[in-house]
């Protein structure tokens, strides 16, 4: 069974929701309310010591970070593959994913965090 620890306002979580939908996988969802600082709850920090969302738990093992979660899902459930087989195309996909994670997501994260403290 899959359990996804989420926060719906998180753009990183949205990426994982899309991957799960593309794979047609069912999962349990656990809301981690960042507005209420639930990411710092000791129980959640046992699952993800960095205190971020999303985190996927599968077979008792936690996978943090949205891009890693998406790759894990694609490799674990190979039906309807999302990652190309061709090494060059795979490297381009990872390059784009890294660009999004390090620029777009980082910018939206900073904006979101600034709104939390208003």
Where are these regions (language model features)?
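GST-like domain detector, emphasizing the conserved glutathione-binding G-site
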Residues: 1-116
């Amino acid at each position: 069974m899959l359990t996804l620890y989420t926060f719906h306002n998180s753009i990183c979580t949205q990426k994982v929701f899309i991957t799960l939908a593309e794979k047609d996988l069912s999962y349990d969802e656990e809301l981690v309310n960042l507005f209420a600082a639930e990411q710092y709850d000791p129980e959640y920090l046992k699952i993800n010591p960095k205190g971020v969302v999303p985190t996927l738990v599968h077979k008792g093992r936690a996978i943090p970070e949205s891009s890693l979660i998406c790759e894990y899902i694609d490799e674990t459930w190979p039906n309807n593959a999302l990652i190309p087989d061709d090494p060059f195309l795979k490297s381009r996909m990872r390059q784009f994913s890294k660009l999004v994670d390090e620029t777009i997501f980082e910018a939206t994260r900073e904006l979101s965090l600034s709104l939390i403290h208003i």
